[in-house]
Regions:
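Cell-envelope/glycan interface and biosynthesis
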Residues: 1-166
Length: 166
């Protein structure tokens, strides 16, 4: 993970432990192109070769936020299974309600599948910086909508979170 994102993640994990006594753990962070290819190809096999179906769950190599060093799949220490049920755990609920305080967003929320293109992933957080995370949380919109609407059609670098000057 990038250093700024990794520091924020450590702060988030410490706050969760302090506030509700739950230990969060990193499950999957930075991925190389090769690792993402393996993950994608494995999903492709599990869904019978349908790229359309695989694309709902796993980013194609070269298109994964994990390759940016800004995303982390998180779990609770008691289980590292990446399933929708994580969202119903104390840790999952805490992440959903509090990750923005540390500059993260819950990237693939329930009900946003048609906008994000991915199924609900309560374990997948994406670092966007504290200012952007607070604005996204307040607006209750996915990153795609924020990048277009909240900044008034201004181009925003999704890696740095800074406005791109013309």
């Amino acid at each position: 993970m990038r250093e700024d994102a990794a520091c924020a993640l450590e702060e988030m994990f410490a706050a969760c432990k302090e506030e509700i006594g739950v230990t969060l753990t990193s499950v999957s962070g930075y991925r190389s192109y090769s690792k993402q290819s393996t993950i994608y190809n494995n999903k492709l096999k599990r869904v019978g070769g349908s790229r359309e179906k695989a694309d709902e769950y796993v980013a194609r190599p070269g298109a994964s936020e994990h390759q940016l060093g800004l995303a982390m799949d998180v779990g609770q220490k008691s289980t590292t299974n990446l399933t929708a049920s994580f969202g119903n755990t104390r840790g999952g609920a805490w992440v959903r309600e509090n990750c923005w305080r540390f500059g993260f967003i819950l990237r693939y929320q329930e009900g946003w599948e048609d906008i994000t293109g991915y199924q609900y992933e309560p374990w997948h957080v994406r670092y966007v910086g504290k200012e952007n995370a607070a604005l996204i949380q307040e607006a209750n919109v996915p990153l795609e909508t924020y990048l277009v609407d909240i900044r008034g059609q201004t181009l925003l670098d999704i890696v740095t979170g800074k406005i791109i000057e013309d």
